[in-house]
Amino acid sequence: MEMYFKRMKDEWTGLVEQADPLIRAKAAEIALAHAHYLSIEFYRIVRIDPHAEEFLSNEQVERQLKSAMERWIINVLSAQVDDVERLIQIQHTVAEVHARIGIPVEIVEMGFRVLKKILYPVIFSSDYSAAEKLQVYHFSINSIDIAMEVMTRAFTFSDSSASKEDENYRIFSLLENGEEEKERQIASILSWEIDIIYKVLLDSDLGSSLPLSQADFGLWFNHKGRHYFSGIAEVGHISRLIQDFDGIFNQTMRNTRILNNRSLRVKFLLQIRNTVSQIITLLRELFEEVSRHEVGMDVLTKLLNRRFLPTIFKREIAHANRTGTPLSVLIIDVDKFKEINDTWGHNTGDEILRKVSFLSQKRLVKSKILGAGSSRKLAVS
């Protein structure tokens, strides 16, 4: 991304440098005189789109956005060479905000199209000469297009990062008790193995035993595990091991005389041991691979830390909009925290935070989410 931003900085700088100073001054004049009207007209048109209105219906937000749009128009159309780097950073910041609250890129692109459409009559109704109007329009449109390209590219990057964080949170929430889940599944596959070994050794028969894919572990892996760990190489290895052993198992079930032969029986049991051993090793590696997602947990309070708050808020806002239900966020500030640390020491302060988080979590209903907002604040949604 750094190389891309450098290239766009050079292009934007070139546009400003090559433009006639008089034309730049007239573009800035248009922006200062008409930014307020353009922002009002912009949101009037954009809000006609039902999808866009989801993000713009709140009156307070709309007022903030209108003033922000005014500033954006003035900044972009009044750009000097020394402003370019700052303007690129502004586009990046706006894109990050759009990605964080889930505004689709197509709405952003529609907004730019609307802006260029309503800018045209404003420029051509001015008292400039025909040649000046054309040059001002070209400079303004090119400036907006560069800003749009930077914002869109930054949005795509931020949206991709946000999507990865959403996926990380999904895995984290599913595997919050990863160690317990790992041991449960290892115990499950070992129980299946022991059951078969006993039947083979005592009866030389598999009886009503199930193939691995239909046993408890196999069902968990195929219906949950594969989804939890999607994209990790070990998943494919475990799938092949299950599939290969099911073939051996089904062949043995069809020809039970195999187990009456001592050497074939020993071979079958060794195949079971080898398969289960490999699966357990790979399963441990899978859980170790996702254990890095535990950085999403605050070490002290064992609550979700700020890393996942944007993901959680985005999800909760979307749910509230979809269902038409109110959404509240409670910020709990642990008072006199510095005084406690200074008087009684950090260990006492840490213990108080642990106690507050424990009691808060204990009193919350299951559907509520408690997270650590900062060193002394808890957030509830």
Curated annotation (Swiss-Prot):
Binding site for heme: 98
GO cellular component, one term: plasma membrane
Binding site for Mg(2+): 333
Gene3D superfamilies documented for this protein: 3.30.70.270, Globins (1.10.490.10)
Binding site for substrate: 341, 350
Cofactor note: Binds 1 heme group per subunit.
InterPro entries documented for this protein: Diguanylate_Cyclase, DosC_2nd, DosC_GS, GGDEF_dom, Globin-like_sf, Globin-sensor_dom, Globin/Proto, Nucleotide_cyclase
CDD domains membership: GGDEF, GS_EcDosC-like_GGDEF
Gene Ontology molecular function terms on file: diguanylate cyclase activity; GTP binding; heme binding; metal ion binding; oxygen binding
Swiss-Prot/TrEMBL domain comment: Is composed of an N-terminal sensory globin-fold domain that binds heme and oxygen, and a C-terminal GGDEF diguanylate cyclase domain.
Name listed for the protein in its UniProt record: Diguanylate cyclase DosC
Gene symbol of the encoding locus: dosC
